Design a protein with these regions (language model features):
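Short aromatic/hydrophobic "clamp" motif used to bind/position activated sugar donors
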Residues: 6
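Short, high-confidence coil segments that cap the C-terminus of an alpha-helix
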Residues: 3, 30-32, 111
Length: 166
């Protein structure tokens, strides 16, 4: 990449024009080195655990610790390359590792870290069609308690495999 700015976006994420503009303006302004945005799901607000609690908890964590959801990350290209980019050792959660590395290199270079709160990006809830709240909970708890599982492809099947119907 030869551009001065990089934006990483999931193919199934919708970015409101003003969110995109905030990211580009922040990077072009020179004070911000990297950032992300809060998110909402495009469906299933009635599912309390997976449709409301998990996205809300993620938004709180991402605001508090400035960790970026993989659905929308923006940064200065030189900072991305300086920090080594995405880790190739992780099958999931690589955006968390990248967030931490980008924050560190941004601050080292005197740049701010930005979290866009409004409007949030709209992320796909399609996995809620595939998994029940209980199934999601059974997949998430081991990953939270043992993050080394993020380096195990089988443990990260939730992000890659569509379950088969019996």
């Amino acid at each position: 990449a030869r551009a001065g700015n990089l934006i990483f976006l999931d193919a199934d994420t919708l970015v409101p024009p003003s969110t995109f503009a905030q990211a580009v303006e922040a990077l072009n302004g020179g004070e911000v080195g990297c950032g992300g945005a809060q998110l909402v799901l495009d469906a299933y607000p009635s599912r309390w655990f997976a449709g409301q609690f998990l996205p809300g908890a993620w938004n709180w964590i991402s605001r508090k610790f400035k960790l970026f959801a993989g659905s929308f990350i923006f940064c200065r290209a030189e900072l991305f390359f300086d920090c080594g980019g995405f880790p190739e050792t992780h099958f999931a959660g690589e955006e968390i590792v990248l967030s931490r590395k980008l924050k560190k290199v941004s601050r080292k270079n005197g740049k701010k870290v930005m979290m866009i709160s409004h409007p949030p990006v709209i992320s796909s809830a399609r996995k809620l069609d595939w998994y029940s709240d209980l199934a999601i909970l059974r997949l998430v708890i081991p990953l939270l308690g043992m993050p080394f599982f993020l380096r195990n492809q089988k443990a990260c099947r939730f992000w890659y495999d569509r379950p088969t119907k019996d």
